[in-house]
Amino acid sequence: MNYLFTSESVSEGHPDKVADQISDAILDEFLRQDPESKVACESFCSTGMVVVMGEVKSEAYVDIQTTVRSTINRIGYNKAEYMFDGNSCGVMSALHEQSADINRGVERGNEEEQGAGDQGMMFGYACRDTENYMPLPLYLSHRLLEILADIRHHEPELMPYLRPDAKSQFTIEYDGETHQPVKVDTIVLSTQHDEFVPASLGRMSYADAVKQYGQAKVDFEMQAKIRYDVETILIPRLKAALPEETARLVHSFILHVNPTGKFVIGGPHGDTGLTGRKIIVDTYGGKGAHGGGAFSGKDPSKVDRSAAYAARYIAKNLVAAGVADECLVQLAYAIGVARPVSVFVDTYGTAKNGLQDGEIAKKVSEIFDLRPAKIIDRFGLKNPIYAPTAAYGHMGRKPYTQAVTVQGKRKIVQFFGWELLDSVPLVKKAFGL
């Protein structure tokens, strides 16, 4: 029997994502000046204010005010009417020095034996739903909001009422036997917007339209216009951006647009934002598992982040190599200890050639060096690469290289290196595939 599975995403303007982006922008600035920086930066944002908190050990000086304000303005919160404006909001910093007790366990004379920054378990997941080995409902949720943001930033005349905050949700019907996607069942989109008068009511101010037609009529026509634009502009652009095989699944679906009827008050004025509250959006949309640790604002000595990236890399390369059609990898660490205390693999019964999950986990431990220092080196995690990860998912992104400034010099660095498939030949050889 077929079944439904749902995942959601949130836009760069969602208050929790604003906080994530602030934290990662600050982390990048520390790493840009001092790649050995140890940073745990949390951000809080609400009406007209941002508070930055956390622990740092670094030789760098970061202008917190400038970094915070430029991040907020880039997202699009640059008008006083939003009640959260990068040019005028209050910014308070409460950063202080990292605990010496923690630092003692992380920094070692032999860098290769650098201990894990904390205990815990981290998960990586991959499947064959999509070309990037991500679950389809989350993949589509991210892409829809990326396209919406692109319209808001670069073609505002198409949907001129858009504001930065938005949420999306996709429900996918799966085949009960093959567990492959059959079709999109339901799309939910809530997008923040200006109060405006649609052309159907004539040219006048919103206040005058309410006087003439009444609040209910104006708001109904306003939402009808937004829905029309979603159906005729946004959804077609989503389908055009998808691989043909995936685009064919987007048909005859249920669509909910701003189901509350109005979404004018939003962003940090509508809801408080806090770093690390969108960990399922950041990872796999509820598929697989999550160890509980957030990513943004944490330097790579924190295995919450670096080991989660490594686990995704392993799972993706295993699936791409044909070891299994679906794969969950768990890594677990003890604070101050370099090597993981356990490596676990679950292929959900999809492993090929009679392979057992325990056998796969054993080979993973042999193939991949999972000490934090080696993970950091493999993916170049001491570089300022984190700001782009803080919206639209840390996983399933397209890897690329770009020139950045580090310690006053330009260098080419890898972004989203954990999404590379460069270990597929090694995996195939190890498993005789």
Can you describe what each PLM-predicted range is?
Residues 40-58, 335-339:
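Short, charge-patterned binding micro-sites
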Residues 8-10, 14-19, 115-131, 264-289, ...:
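Conserved phosphate/anionic-ligand binding catalytic regions in large, soluble enzymes, centered on
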Residues 1-40, 430:
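N-terminal, positively charged regions that mediate nucleic acid binding
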Residues 6, 66, 73-265, 391, ...:
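Glycine-rich, mobile lid/loop segments that gate access to catalytic sites or pores
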Residues 46, 326, 333-433:
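Internal helix-turn-beta structural module
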